[in-house]
Amino acid sequence: MTQTLVDEGSTVALFGFGITGRAVTAALLERKASVLVFDDSPSEEMSGIAQAMGVDLNIPNSEQGLQELIKDVDFAVPTPGLPENHFFFECMKEKRIPILTEFDLSAQWDQRPILAITGTNGKTTVCTMVHQMLKKSGRASALAGNTDTPLVSAIGNDETETMVVEASSFRLSR
């Protein structure tokens, strides 16, 4: 994880505007960062959500087009499902733009304990069990990651003591 903080005044390129992308965008905007959002094939729903959030949803037609748009970017955040061979990564590498993940951002913004569970099979089951065990023991926990709740959203709940995160390999590979 990089130690540089994304905060007010930072310009961030976010690639992928699904559930996690929208949550990361909201978290960045809340922290007064400028966000450039990209998606290869946005739906009408995504376009409407982006408009409501006050961000432009860009469709990069080429590596060259993307490089022009990211010339003033401080950081880049790919969403978990973006393939490693996508030209987004090569553009960021060429421009020497640090790539952060949702987990990196969450760790920068929140210091509460995170129990991250990974593996080939059984992640959801184990996460659910750990979450229930924590609740039964009186600890307020949140279930996040590959679930319906991105970690950047879960950290917004101040009552939560511990984050239980389902972290599959595509989330940890960056």
Q: How would you label these PLM feature ranges?
A:
Residues M1-T101, L105:
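N-terminal leader/targeting and accessory segments in enzymes
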